[in-house]
Amino acid sequence: MAFITNSQGGSKNETKGGPGALVLLPFTFVGRTVIDWVDNLGAATIFLFTALTKTFGRKQLFKIVEQIYYIGAKSITIIMLVSLFTGMVLGLQSYHALVKFGAQGALGSLVSLSLIMELGPVLTAIMITARAGSAITAEIGIQRISEQIDALHTMRINPLRYLVSPKIIAAIISFPLLTAVFDLVGIIGGYISGVVLLGVNAGVYLHSIQAYVDLRDIINGFIKVIVFAVIVSTVCCYQGYFAHMRKDSHGAQAVGLATTSAVVLSCVLILVSDYVVTSLLI
């Protein structure tokens, strides 16, 4: 029942919907959610391709290098720390599983393949999302709500070229480099755990890596992380760029919610795309 005031100043009770409306409510919610999701997907895709077309320019190289330092170089410490202990834990768990079958000689290949094909790309992307992706969203979001982006329009400076495209290109360059660091340090962590602490023969560990890891595995890992780089950079830039258009909040609160949405959505899409890309590469 809804309370409605008529044109003569009185009021009346009017029944809106009924049992049929209650039945249709779940379908309405699902339909609206799907439509909003498809709309945002299309808008983000257009946003990505528009930003990429604005990449080339004389002044862009400096900004790309600046973003590579911000996204890549400043993330290397946390990447090395996480990868070292990931490799050590993986080596420890794998050793105790393999020793039951007398196959501890395969420890090197198991650790290296797990890192190169799965854990390296995925964990690298998630860690960069947490450290740099959230900061990118907050930075662009603050520039939006403080009308700095509007000022760029006034000065006839394209905001996508100035703010967005350097970040996307820098992410595409930085993610594979950091993944290579993650893989290498993780394999060293597995060596420390398996060889130094558990007594696996060092030659057997290294020979196992050489025998079972080939170039195709490495390339597949880099393909994955490039896909992750495009997803993370696009989502984080898009959420920040359109933070002022959020329906659930405005101002500083909108920036905070946009940052949270960017990190959560990026992590979910990393895992979803990991399955999709893996199924295509196998």
Predicted regions and their residues:
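Hydrophobic alpha-helical transmembrane segments that constitute the membrane-spanning cores
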Residues: V82-F85, A125, S165-G194, V235, ...
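Final/C-terminal transmembrane alpha-helix of multipass membrane proteins
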Residues: V255, T260-V277
